[in-house]
C-alpha cells in the first residue's frame, strides 16, 4: 500500500542522496520527527551511487576538520545502530610528497592536523612503501599518514542513514518530484508535488547538481557547476582489504581498494563541464560515456606510481558528473534571498567524507537558527554578485577543479574570470605597478612593484618569503613614516535609515551607536552565544541614518545578518550602496598635511578628532571623510561618489609628492594591522569568539543599561571567566614564516593554534595571533605566565607572548 503524502511537516528535505538522507537523519535525532524527505526518483540515484567513497578529514579550517571528523564517528556506529552494512573501514589515508616544496606543504599540514587534534604521522619513503607496497617510491621525499581516515560504500551509507531517519519517525517518499514552492512575503509556506501539497516551516534543498537551477526559480543563488569526473575500477589482483587510501597530488591521482582491486581517479587540469544548459530529463542512475582520451593523462600518471596497473584488467572507466563550486568548498546554510530556504549542495567530490557532519550541521541550522559552530568557509553567504553569472561561475569553478591537487600556495590568487569588478582607479594603479588580488570579484592592489627598478608586478609563490616581501616592506615604511593611499573601493557599504534606525542598530550592535550625528563607532554584532557575527564601522550621518562599512568578502553575510535582526515592528530599511562609493584610505603621519593642501575644510585634530565623520570638499568633489584607521596611524577613509574618484586621487597624489605620498596595497595593511593588534573577522574573530575572549571588551556597551543581542552571554562570561583568550606571539627566530594554524605550546602542552600570521616590518619580526585555551579557565596571568613555543612545519620555535599591541599601545599616533 502506497503511503499517503502528509498535509503538513515541520521540514521538507528535497533530495535523497547522502546529504539529504544525512540531514533527514539528524533532523529526526533532534526531535523533528514530522520531517519529510522527497526524492524525485530513487535514493542515491543522482550522484551518490557513483561516488568513489574516500573519507579524509583534514582541512585548513579547524571547524570543517571537526565536521569531517564527526562523519567518521557517525560512520563507525551507523551499522550497529541501523543493522545495515555501510562498507565503512578505517584503513587510514596516505598522502605523498614528491618534491621539497610539497614536503614543506605536507609538514605544514601535519602541524595543522596536530593543532586540530587529528593524528598525522610523517613517514619516510620506505615507511610509506611498507604501508602501500604496490607503489614505486624512487621520486618520494616523504609521506604523511592519517590513521583515522578511511573509505565507505556511498549507497550503503545512504540507505543506513535513511533507515535511521525512518527509525526516528521521518517519512521518506521516492518518485516524488517537487514541482513548486509556495512563498508568501519572502518566506516558504508550502511544497507542491504531483502527489500533493505539504505545508511546512522549512525547506532544505540537498538536490546535488539540480540545486542551482531549482533554487534559481525562487531567486536563490547557489553557485555550482556539474563537471565530468572519471575513475577506473580494476579487476581483482590480490590487493589486501586493509590497504590505506592513497592520495598522490603531484601525480594528480587518488586510490582506494575495491574488492581486491583498485579504484583510481584524479583531478586533471583541463576538466570538462557537463549540462551547462540544463540536466536532461530522466537523468538518474545514469553515467556518461567514458572518455578514454581525456583520462589518458591521469592514467599515465598512475602507471608511473603503480606499475602493476599496466597488467591488470579494467572492469570499468566510470564517468559521472559531480557538482563543484568556485572555491572548492561545499555550500551550507539558509539562503539570504529567501527565509526558511536552506541549502546543502556542491560537495566537490568529497560529499561522502562531508555528509555525516554536513547533515548534522544543517539540521542544527534548521532547528536552532544557527550552526553548531562557525562554518564560514562553507556558508552560502560567502558568495556575492559575480556568482549570479553562470559563465563566471563556470570559468572559476573549472579553475578550482584543476587546482584540486596542485600546490596550495600561501597567498595564491585565482586567475580566471578576471578582471570582473574594477575600481575607477584600476587602470591608473595598474600603470603604476599594482599587482592585483581578487576578492568577491573585486580587483584589489595587493602590492606595488617598482617599475623603475624593473620589478615585475607578479606573485611568485613559495613557502618561504615570497618575491613581494621587500616591496611590501617599502609600503609599510611609508605608512609608518610618511603617507600612503590604499584603494579600498571594494569595501561593502550599507545605509540604514528610518525613524527607528537608532533603536534597531542599538539592538544589533554591541557598542553604543546612540551617539550624535558625526560620530563614528567600531562595533561587533553578536549572536545569542556572544559570538561575533559582524565586525563593522558605523558612522551616524543624519538623525535617522547610519552609514555602515565592512570587509569586501562579508558583503552578503553582513547585509543578511543586519537585515534579519532588525526587529519586525521597527521602521528601518537597509540599503546596499557599495557600488555608489569609491574609498581612498589616506594613512600615515603626513596624511593630515596632505589633506590640508587639497581641502578648505578644517581637518585639525580639534575640528576633526579621531572617531568622527565629516563631509569635506576636495577639488569640487563631496567627500565623506571617516577619521579611522586599520593600520595604526593617523589617517582618513575618504568615501567618494564613484564618478569623482579619479579626480580626488589625482589631486591627492599631486599634493602629496613632496610629503612622501606612496601607493600601497592590502599586504601592507595586513602587516600593519598585525603590529597594531587589530583583529580580522574570519580568522581572529568570528561566531565562535566573543569580544571578551578576543580582547575587545572595551567595544561592548556593558556599562550602559542598553539591551542588545548577545548581552546575556557577555554578562555570563564577565561573571564566570573565559576558557580561551586571544594573544600575540612573537617567535625568537626572525626568519620564521607564520601563515596561521601553527600549533601553540604553553609549558610543553598544546593549548591552541595561530588564527593568523605574518611579518611586522617595524618590529623586524614575524607576528602571530591565536587563542590560548584551557578548560579550567584562561586569565591574563595564565596567558602571560607560561613559556611558549610555536610548531612551524613540525619544528618547535620559542616565542614571546603579549596581550598588548606591539605598536603604539597608547594610541598616541592614531589620535595625533
List each model region and its residues.
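Flavin-dependent oxidoreductases
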Residues: 22, 62, 180-289, 297-308, ...
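Beta1/beta-strand and adjacent pyrophosphate-binding region of the FAD-binding site
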Residues: 4-19, 36
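Central beta-strand plus flanking loop segment that forms part of the substrate or channel wall
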Residues: 52-57, 93-95, 209, 218-241, ...
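Glycine-rich FAD pyrophosphate-binding loop
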Residues: 28-49
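Glycine/proline-enriched, intrinsically flexible loops and inter-domain linkers
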Residues: 373, 380-816
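Flavin (FAD/FMN) cofactor-binding and adjacent substrate-gating region
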Residues: 74-77, 89, 98-174, 179-187, ...
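Dinucleotide-binding Rossmann-like beta1-alpha1 core, especially the glycine-rich loop
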Residues: 53-131, 250-255, 259-261, 282, ...
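C-terminal catalytic lobe of FAD-dependent flavoproteins
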Residues: 154, 250, 259, 281, ...
Amino acid at each position: 500500500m502506497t503511503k499517503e503524502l502528509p498535509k503538513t511537516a515541520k521540514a521538507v528535505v528535497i533530495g535523497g542522496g547522502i546529504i539529504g538522507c544525512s540531514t533527514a537523519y539528524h533532523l529526526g535525532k533532534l526531535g523533528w520527527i514530522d520531517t519529510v524527505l522527497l526524492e524525485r526518483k530513487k535514493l542515491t540515484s543522482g550522484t551518490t551511487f557513483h561516488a568513489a567513497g574516500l573519507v579524509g578529514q583534514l582541512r585548513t579550517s579547524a571547524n570543517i576538520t571537526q565536521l569531517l571528523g564527526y562523519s567518521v564517528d557517525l560512520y563507525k556506529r551507523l551499522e550497529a545502530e541501523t543493522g545495515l552494512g555501510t562498507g565503512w573501514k578505517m584503513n587510514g589515508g596516505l598522502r605523498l610528497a614528491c618534491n621539497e616544496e610539497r614536503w614543506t606543504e605536507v609538514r605544514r599540514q601535519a602541524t595543522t592536523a596536530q593543532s586540530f587534534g587529528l593524528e598525522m604521522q610523517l613517514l619516510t619513503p620506505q615507511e610509506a612503501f611498507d604501508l602501500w607496497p604496490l607503489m614505486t617510491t624512487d621520486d618520494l621525499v616523504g609521506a604523511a599518514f592519517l590513521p583515522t581516515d578511511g573509505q565507505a560504500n556511498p549507497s550503503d551509507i545512504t540507505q543506513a542513514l535513511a533507515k535511521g531517519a525512518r527509525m526516528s519517525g521521518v517519512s521518506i517518499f521516492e518518485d516524488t518530484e517537487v514541482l513548486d514552492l509556495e512563498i508568501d512575503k519572502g518566506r516558504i509556506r508550502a511544497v507542491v508535488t504531483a502527489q500533493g501539497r505539504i505545508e511546512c516551516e522549512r525547506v532544505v534543498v540537498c538536490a546535488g547538481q539540480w540545486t542551482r537551477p531549482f533554487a534559481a526559480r525562487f531567486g536563490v543563488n547557489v553557485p555550482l557547476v556539474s563537471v565530468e569526473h572519471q575513475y577506473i575500477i580494476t579487476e581483482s589482483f590480490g590487493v589486501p582489504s586493509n590497504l590505506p587510501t592513497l592520495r598522490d597530488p603531484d601525480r594528480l591521482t587518488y586510490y582506494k581498494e575495491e574488492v581486491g582491486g583498485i579504484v583510481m581517479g584524479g583531478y586533471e587540469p583541463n576538466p570538462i563541464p557537463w549540462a551547462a544548459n540544463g540536466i536532461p530529463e530522466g537523468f538518474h542512475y545514469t553515467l556518461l560515456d567514458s572518455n578514454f582520451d581525456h583520462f589518458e593523462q591521469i592514467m599515465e600518471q598512475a602507471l608511473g606510481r603503480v606499475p602493476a596497473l599496466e597488467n591488470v584488467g579494467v572492469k570499468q572507466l566510470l564517468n559521472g558528473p559531480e557538482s563543484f563550486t568556485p572555491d572548492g568548498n561545499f555550500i551550507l546554510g539558509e539562503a539570504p534571498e529567501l527565509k526558511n530556504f536552506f541549502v546543502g549542495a556542491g560537495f566537490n567530490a568529497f560529499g561522502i567524507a562531508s555528509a555525516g557532519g554536513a547533515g548534522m550541521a544543517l539540521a542544527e541550522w534548521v532547528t536552532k537558527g544557527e550552526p553548531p559552530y562557525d562554518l564560514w568557509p562553507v556558508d552560502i553567504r560567502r558568495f556575492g554578485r559575480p556568482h549570479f553569472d553562470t559563465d563566471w561561475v563556470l570559468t572559476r569553478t573549472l579553475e578550482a577543479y584543476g587546482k584540486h591537487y596542485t600546490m596550495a600556495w600561501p597567498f595564491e590568487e585565482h586567475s580566471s574570470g578576471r578582471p570582473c569588478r574594477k575600481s575607477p582607479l584600476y587602470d591608473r594603479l595598474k600603470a603604476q605597478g599594482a599587482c592585483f588580488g581578487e576578492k568577491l570579484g573585486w580587483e584589489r592592489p595587493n602590492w606595488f612593484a617598482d617599475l623603475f627598478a624593473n620589478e615585475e608586478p607578479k606573485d611568485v609563490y613559495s613557502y618561504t618569503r615570497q618575491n613581494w616581501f621587500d616591496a611590501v616592506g617599502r609600503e609599510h615604511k611609508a605608512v609608518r613614516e610618511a603617507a600612503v593611499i590604499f584603494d579600498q573601493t571594494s569595501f561593502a557599504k550599507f545605509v540604514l535609515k528610518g525613524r527607528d534606525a537608532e533603536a534597531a542598530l542599538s539592538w544589533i550592535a554591541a557598542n553604543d551607536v546612540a551617539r550624535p550625528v558625526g560620530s563614528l563607532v567600531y562595533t561587533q554584532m553578536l549572536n545569542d552565544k556572544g559570538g561575533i557575527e559582524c565586525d563593522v564601522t558605523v558612522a551616524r550621518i543624519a538623525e535617522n541614518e547610519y552609514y555602515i562599512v565592512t570587509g569586501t568578502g562579508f558583503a552578503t553575510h553582513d547585509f543578511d545578518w543586519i537585515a534579519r535582526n532588525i526587529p519586525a515592528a521597527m521602521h528601518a530599511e537597509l540599503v546596499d550602496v557599495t557600488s555608489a562609493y569609491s574609498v581612498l584610505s589616506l594613512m600615515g603621519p603626513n596624511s593630515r598635511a596632505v589633506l590640508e593642501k587639497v581641502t578648505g575644510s578644517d581637518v585639525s585634530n580639534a575640528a576633526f578628532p579621531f572617531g568622527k565623520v565629516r563631509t569635506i570638499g576636495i577639488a569640487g568633489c563631496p567627500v565623506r571623510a571617516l577619521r579611522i584607521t586599520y593600520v595604526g596611524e593617523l589617517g582618513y577613509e575618504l568615501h567618494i561618489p564613484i564618478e569623482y574618484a579619479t579626480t580626488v586621487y589625482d589631486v591627492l597624489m599631486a599634493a602629496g609628492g613632496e610629503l612622501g605620498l606612496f601607493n600601497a596595497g592590502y599586504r601592507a595593511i595586513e602587516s600593519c594591522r598585525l603590529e597594531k593588534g587589530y583583529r580580522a573577522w574570519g580568522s581572529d574573530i568570528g561566531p565562535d569568539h566573543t569580544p571578551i575572549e578576543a580582547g575587545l571588551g572595551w567595544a561592548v556597551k556593558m556599562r550602559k543599561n542598553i539591551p542588545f543581542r548577545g548581552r546575556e552571554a557577555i554578562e555570563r562570561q564577565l561573571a564566570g571567566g573565559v576558557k580561551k583568550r586571544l594573544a600575540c606571539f612573537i617567535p625568537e627566530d626572525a626568519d620564521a614564516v607564520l601563515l596561521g594554524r601553527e600549533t601553540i605550546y604553553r609549558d610543553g602542552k598544546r593549548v591552541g593554534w595561530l588564527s593568523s600570521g605574518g611579518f611586522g616590518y617595524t618590529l623586524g619580526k614575524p607576528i602571530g595571533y591565536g587563542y590560548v585555551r584551557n578548560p579550567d579557565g584562561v586569565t591574563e596571568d595564565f596567558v602571560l605566565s607560561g613559556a611558549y613555543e610555536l610548531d612551524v612545519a613540525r619544528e618547535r620555535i620559542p616565542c614571546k607572548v603579549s596581550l598588548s599591541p606591539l605598536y603604539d599601545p597608547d594610541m598616541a599616533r592614531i589620535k595625533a
